[in-house]
């Protein structure tokens, strides 16, 4: 838990920056938010009900390791994925691979194995994946990382999702 002083308070809105929260207090996924109102006339602050908000993970890097398979055979191996926020030891983590193709794209979901501690670096094994170029999403307790979009109007892939991507050979 962390106490953050709001940047702005009105009758209908409270604005605060998550950058003011100590980094070890935030994790990807669903977070509780509660308002504590202290008063000079009371030693005990008045607390609001907790309200959930979703903090999306961001994939900062992805690498393929220990790939097995030849020719057109499905591949097995592991993905080493780094996130911008810690993932809790007890949080459910799923990696989604969406083939980057305009034809019928393959889709794969792989659950990360249990972890002994919070981490920003995850190793997720995969099996049965056809060789190809894939968009990758990290899902932590139901909160999906966002995909990047090609914003170059002169590009053949303008407005297509384009990152993060990984090639499985």
Which residue stretches match the model-derived regions?
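Short beta-strand elements
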Residues: 41-62, 144-169
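Immunoglobulin-like IPT/TIG beta-sandwich domains and homologous Ig-like subdomains
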Residues: 1-43, 72-144
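Generic preference for flexible, low-structure residues
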Residues: 69, 111, 150-154
């Amino acid at each position: 838990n962390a106490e953050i002083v709001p940047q702005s308070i009105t009758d209908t809105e409270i604005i605060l920056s998550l950058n003011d929260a100590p980094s070890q207090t935030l994790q990807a996924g669903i977070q509780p938010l509660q308002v504590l109102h202290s008063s000079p006339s009371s030693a005990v602050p008045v607390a609001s009900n907790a309200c959930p908000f979703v903090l999306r993970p961001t994939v900062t890097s992805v690498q393929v390791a220990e790939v097995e398979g030849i020719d057109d055979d499905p591949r097995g191996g592991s993905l080493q994925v780094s996130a911008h926020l810690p993932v809790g030891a007890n949080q459910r983590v799923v990696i989604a691979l969406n083939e980057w193709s305009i034809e019928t794209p393959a889709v794969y979901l792989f659950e990360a194995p249990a972890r002994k501690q919070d981490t920003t670096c995850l190793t997720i094994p995969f099996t049965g994946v056809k060789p190809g170029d894939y968009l990758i999403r990290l899902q932590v307790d139901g909160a999906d990382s966002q995909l990047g979009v090609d914003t170059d109007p002169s590009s053949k892939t303008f407005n297509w999702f384009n990152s993060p991507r990984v090639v499985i050979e």
